[in-house]
From Swiss-Prot:
Pathway recorded for this protein: Energy metabolism; oxidative phosphorylation
Keywords tagged on the record: Cell inner membrane, Cell membrane, Electron transport, Heme, Hydrogen ion transport, Ion transport, Iron, Membrane, Metal-binding, Oxidoreductase, Plasmid, Repeat, Respiratory chain, Transmembrane, Transmembrane helix, Transport
Note on how the cofactor is bound: Binds 2 heme C groups per subunit.
Organism: Rhizobium etli (strain ATCC 51251 / DSM 11541 / JCM 21823 / NBRC 15573 / CFN 42)
Protein name: Cbb3-type cytochrome c oxidase subunit FixP
UniProt similarity note: Belongs to the CcoP / FixP family.
Localization (cell): Cell inner membrane
Domain of life: Bacteria
Molecular function terms, GO-annotated: electron transfer activity; heme binding; iron ion binding; oxidoreductase activity
Amino acid sequence: MSQKHIDELSGVETTGHEWDGIQELNNPMPRWWIWTFYVTILWAIGYAIAYPAIPMITSATNGYLGYSTRAELQQDLNLAKSSQTEFHDLIAAKTVEEIDADPALRKFAIAGGASAFKVNCAPCHGSGASGGPGFPNLNDDDWLWGGDLNAIQATISHGIRFDGDTDSHSSEMPPFAGVLEPIQMKQVAAFVWGLTNTPSDVGLAAAGKQVFFDNCAPCHGEDAKGKVEMGAPDLADAIWLKSRGEDAILRQVASPKHGVMPAWAARLGDTTVNELTIFVHALGGGT
């Protein structure tokens, strides 16, 4: 048997360990601590009986109380949905102009539209709706297909160049690589860039004016401010959808790229489309 070590000062048995002359007393645990430990064991057993706790092969024990966090969540969702039913019904039934004119409905629609935007639109247009190369900035006042409430609603509902919707906006700029000479494409690129910036070659830009009038003005207008009815962009506002610079313009003239936006009406429904319309219009660029 091992010899017991007794502390001379207190008369209490020690653990037998010593660190730099310091010994640890082997006092028993307090009674209250022991009873607390027993209570926690009983509480754990009771919890395992009352609540889902024990994992099985394909499921788990349901517990005596039948509690479920998923059921609780569904109950909360149903409660939240029922409290919003009146607003949702009104938003689905009214026109976007009527919604925008009603302060309470407009506030509710903007909140709902912001939520729907983050889920459905932000992957392309960005969380702040500022867009990116090939994806329009929705905060400015430059709109290919119109920026009033009805125009925004139509674009969201039917999309752009979306094959699954016959009412989708559709416009295509033809490739001019086989129509114009290389020098002519450089001239018109310099001219377009020169509308808002200093062209790299003033002579090229001057010659490109006539090339523009002959080939581009029918869609973009003689003033190069675009035509909403055709989805032709304004080339005189220094806002660029694809990228900036004469080289970028030259590439677009030679072999244009066309973006596609899905039609959201069938996927989201009238209520969410109307909410998105109000939200996008309220970003600041709506006309």
